[in-house]
């Protein structure tokens, strides 16, 4: 397969192919421009894969530029987390990290140019009045009484804004376009506003800050971006993007193209809502494994490769749609099924005693680290006469469909012996505390000599060698597919989104690395929690189950 055939195809790549074929561009330059006011989420991953992927495939460049024009909401913590997320996903930006604040001097000069052309003015309406004057989708706006100030007056007032001569909210710079435009974004949008706040890059040099729509297009042009890729909600903003560049003296005029944003079931993507989940302590933090943030997915055990594959599968279109959670889970399940070594852990343990096993004896049984990959080798796991099994793997009575341990019947212990349940011991509440069994000593990893069939296989952990572990069973954070549509999305939080169990694992997991994935046999895929990797007790997070459970949930 050729390189071109192996590439994904979509309408944006078709545009790029045409631009290269026509000679409009000889090299491709894209950018990823996050605002450093929160952690990146799975929706940003789609944009990262698109922009950096295009740069890779077309041997161009992709800039990482922080849209840092609102110092009140931004923080260096978010800057660092975003850089880490981009690199963890497997991408590298071209040259140094860029900031919109790098261009504050040029942006100011371009604003002065618009004033000199009679295309911008200082407005002293209050923010509430500006909203009122802007009109609605069905009613045109009306001109500000300050709209027709002279160029000289506007220059003086804009300089006064810069010098700190106005209080916040008392003045702003607006573009002079058309208050009757059918597009509200073109009704004299604000270009600069006053904020007396220290900026994480420029300190206290500025007290006026440019708005996104003014900053974005000029930053693209200054960096020589050829294709400025945004999500669909910025479609109308393209008119302002072009208006600004058409009316200033700048040699490069990038083009903006819009694609559909990623919507995922059973979660929210709004930074405001995600922030509320964190500040109100509905979750542990931005990296809570139930969060759709890249750091949350990473802590849960998602791999960068699985997220890239997910973004590849959902594709790039102009149609908004909501992706089922099963699609994301399928990507990580396939990845881990292929690559995760196997281990045994008992999540809901009950003691099982093999009464005819030599007392005080133990032995090592060999187990493959991966059933389909002999190159991953084997491991030795201790076995003894007292083991832990999962409570769900035993019943006193059961029908023929139940292929686990039943009183009076046999089952195989994974890679060990065939055992038969003889009797049980219960506490005062009727709860089984111990299962007593016998074993067939001639069945270590082989069938019974007399030819009898033993159909079920269950996993186990030797009690004498067991490693106590905390197991966190994560589920969807919300109980409805579209929590954002609820009047109060917090009322739809799934109270069972985290269930904590105290279990036992085979001793080899004592040296598990944080973030490394394991398949706990018959249970699912788990990883050691990075926040608790050095604690007294090992904490494992369930990344995903062995099978797709979403089809049942949706029925």
Curated annotation (Swiss-Prot):
It catalyses: tRNA(Gln) + L-glutamine + ATP = L-glutaminyl-tRNA(Gln) + AMP + diphosphate. L-glutamine binds at residues 67, 212. A motif ('HIGH' region) lies at residues 34-44. Keywords: Aminoacyl-tRNA synthetase, ATP-binding, Cytoplasm, Ligase, Nucleotide-binding, Protein biosynthesis. It is found in: Cytoplasm. GO terms for biological process: glutaminyl-tRNA aminoacylation; glutamyl-tRNA aminoacylation. Its EC number is 6.1.1.18. ATP binds at residues 35-37, 41-47, 231, 261-262, 269-271. Gene3D superfamilies: Glutamyl-trna Synthetase, Domain 2, Glutamyl-tRNA Synthetase, Domain 3, HUPs, Ribosomal Protein L25, Chain P. PANTHER family: GLUTAMATE--TRNA LIGASE, GLUTAMINE-TRNA LIGASE. This is Glutamine--tRNA ligase. The gene is glnS.
């Amino acid at each position: 397969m050729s390189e071109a055939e192996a590439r994904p195809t979509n309408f944006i790549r078709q545009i790029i192919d045409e631009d290269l074929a026509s000679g409009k561009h000889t090299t491709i330059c894209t950018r990823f421009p996050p605002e450093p006011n929160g952690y990146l989420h799975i929706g940003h991953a789609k944009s990262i894969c698109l922009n950096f992927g295009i740069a890779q495939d077309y041997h161009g460049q992709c800039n990482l530029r922080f849209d840092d024009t609102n110092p009140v909401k931004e923080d260096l913590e978010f800057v660092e987390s975003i850089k880490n997320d981009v690199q963890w996903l497997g991408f590298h930006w071209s040259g140094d990290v860029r900031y919109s604040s790098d261009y504050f001097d040029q942006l100011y000069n371009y604003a002065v140019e618009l004033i000199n052309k009679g295309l911008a003015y200082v407005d002293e309406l209050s923010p509430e009045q500006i909203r009122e004057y802007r009109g609605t989708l069905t009613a045109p706006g009306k001109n500000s009484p300050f709209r027709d100030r002279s160029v000289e007056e506007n220059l003086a007032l804009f300089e006064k804004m810069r010098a700190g001569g106005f209080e916040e909210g008392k003045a702003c710079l607006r573009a002079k376009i058309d208050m009757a435009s059918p597009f509200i974004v073109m009704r004299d949008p604000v270009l600069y506003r006053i904020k007396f706040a220290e900026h994480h890059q420029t300190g206290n040099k500025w007290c006026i800050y440019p708005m996104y729509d003014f900053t974005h297009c000029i930053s693209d042009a200054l960096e020589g971006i050829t294709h400025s890729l945004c999500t669909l909600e910025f479609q109308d903003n393209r008119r302002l993007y072009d208006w600004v560049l058409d009316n200033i003296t700048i040699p490069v005029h990038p083009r903006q193209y819009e694609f559909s944003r990623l919507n995922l079931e059973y979660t929210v993507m709004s930074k405001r809502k995600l922030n509320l989940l964190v500040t109100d302590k509905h979750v542990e933090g931005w990296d809570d494994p139930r969060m759709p943030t890249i750091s949350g997915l990473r802590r849960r055990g998602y791999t960068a490769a699985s997220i890239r594959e997910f973004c590849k599968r959902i594709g790039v279109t102009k149609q908004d749609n909501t992706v089922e959670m099963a699609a994301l889970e399928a990507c990580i399940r396939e990845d881990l099924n292929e690559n995760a070594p196997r281990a045994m852990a008992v999540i809901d343990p009950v003691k099982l005693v093999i009464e005819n096993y030599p007392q005080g004896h133990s032995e090592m049984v060999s187990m493959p680290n991966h059933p389909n990959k002999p190159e991953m080798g084997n491991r030795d796991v201790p076995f003894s006469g007292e083991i832990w099994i999962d409570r769900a793997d035993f019943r006193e009575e059961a029908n023929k469909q139940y292929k686990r341990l039943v009183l009076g019947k046999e089952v195989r212990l994974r890679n060990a012996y065939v055992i038969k349940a003889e009797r049980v011991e219960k506490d005062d509440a009727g709860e089984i505390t111990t299962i007593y069994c016998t074993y067939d000593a001639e069945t270590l990893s082989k069938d019974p000599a007399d030819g009898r069939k033993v159909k079920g296989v269950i996993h186990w952990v030797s009690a004498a060698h067991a490693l106590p572990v905390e197991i966190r069973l994560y589920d969807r954070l919300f109980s409805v597919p579209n929590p954002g549509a609820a009047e109060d999305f917090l009322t739809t939080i799934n109270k069972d989104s985290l269930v904590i169990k105290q279990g036992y694992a085979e001793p080899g997991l004592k040296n598990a690395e944080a973030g490394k994935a394991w398949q706990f046999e018959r249970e699912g895929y788990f990883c050691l929690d990075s926040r608790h990797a050095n604690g007294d007790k090992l904490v494992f997070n369930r990344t995903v189950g062995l099978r797709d459970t979403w089809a049942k949930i949706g029925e």
